[in-house]
Swiss-Prot record:
PANTHER family: CHROMOSOME 2-PARTITIONING PROTEIN PARB-RELATED, CHROMOSOME-PARTITIONING PROTEIN PARB-RELATED. InterPro entries: Chromosome_partition/occlusion, ParB/RepB/Spo0J, ParB/Sulfiredoxin_dom, ParB/Sulfiredoxin_sf. GO terms for cellular component: chromosome. Probably involved in plasmid DNA partitioning. This is Probable plasmid-partitioning protein ParB. GO terms for molecular function: DNA binding. The lineage of its organism: Bacteria, Thermotogati, Deinococcota, Deinococci, Thermales. GO terms for biological process: chromosome segregation. NCBIfam families: parB_part (TIGR00180). Keywords: Chromosome partition, DNA-binding, Plasmid. Signal peptide: none annotated. It holds the Pfam family ParBc. Belongs to the ParB family. Gene3D superfamilies: 1.10.10.2830, 3.90.1530.30.
Length: 297
């Protein structure tokens, strides 16, 4: 029994039995009786290739489902189901498991987290969903709990602000998942939740690594960020990106010219040498400045 089995209990054990000697018999279920559930995996890549493989060889691994009323809910195998529909199949092989709603949610979340093609953003949502399900809290409450745990560890709040039992459970789950510590998750993954939409999209598409997304997040100017994003997609290294971002941030923080410097530039300015439109704009601004300066104090 693995650490994850011990922590999450019967849901995972039932899923493993479905793949072993105690597996229920394989049934052929019509596609129109199958329903999918919400899950952290939003993208389904290479469906056409899988659909072609299914046309040639069929579905090699049965779906895992549970009975819900007159239909069946897919617990594991949504990608195969979608590809089967693309391939024109009318029915698919499946094993029916006796799972409660909570067990089904846990098993589906763990199945998705164990996939190799989850990108960091989807994985982050999946981990939060798993914690939410296990702790009986909303995702927002889980995020708040994790941040309180971090603050408590760093001595910024009193320890008793964080419920001990919940903190211990969080630590157990992260150890069982074996991916990263909860501290690393808070530091490196929670910031992904507040990414601008363009960076979220690029991350979900697998176009950029999450480290680049976090670096690009520092650039507030959308047009500059877009230009840098395209460079990252074209192969700009993280080291080069960090240097570019530092340059952008330096310019953003640079002090604006002092009045004397502006006055010196105006003294050197030859208005007659400017193009008509630009000269008219400068004269308009100078007139506005004069009105402001001569106004009541």
């Amino acid at each position: 029994m693995s650490r994850l089995d011990e922590v999450l209990g019967t849901a995972i054990l039932k899923g493993k039995k479905a793949l072993g000697k105690e597996a229920p018999e394989v049934l052929r279920l019509p596609l129109d009786l199958l329903r999918v559930r919400g899950q952290p995996r939003r993208r389904f890549e290479n469906l056409e290739a899988l659909a072609e493989s299914i046309r040639e060889k069929g579905i090699l691994q049965p779906l895992l489902v549970r009975r819900v009323g007159e239909a069946y809910e897919v617990v594991a195998g949504e990608r195969r189901l979608r590809a089967a529909a693309m391939a024109g199949l009318k029915e698919v092989p499946a094993r029916v498991l006796d799972l409660s709603e909570k067990e089904a949610r846990l098993l589906a979340l763990v199945e998705n987290l164990q996939r190799e093609d989850l990108n960091p953003y989807e994985e982050t949502l999946g981990v939060l969903a798993l914690l939410s399900e296990d702790l009986g809290k909303s995702v927002e409450e889980v995020v708040g709990l994790l941040r309180k745990m971090k603050n408590a560890k760093e001595g910024r709040v009193r320890d008793n602000v964080v419920p001990t039992a919940e903190a211990q459970r969080v630590e157990e789950l992260f150890k069982a998942l074996g991916r990263m510590s909860w501290e690393s998750f808070v530091q490196h993954r929670l910031p992904l939740l507040s990414l601008p939409e363009d960076l979220k999209a690029a991350l979900e598409e697998g176009a950029i690594p999450y480290t680049a997304a976090l670096e690009l997040k520092k650039v507030k100017d959308a047009s500059l960020r877009k230009a840098l994003l395209e460079e990252v997609k074209a192969g700009l290294s993280l080291r080069e990106l960090k240097a570019r971002v530092r340059g952008v941030l330096r310019k953003e923080k640079a002090p604006r010219p002092w009045p004397k410097e502006v006055a010196a530039k105006l003294a050197r300015l030859d208005l007659e040498a400017l193009p008509p439109e630009r000269r008219a704009r400068v004269e308009e601004l100078l007139a506005e400045l004069e009105r402001v300066l001569e106004g009541p104090r």
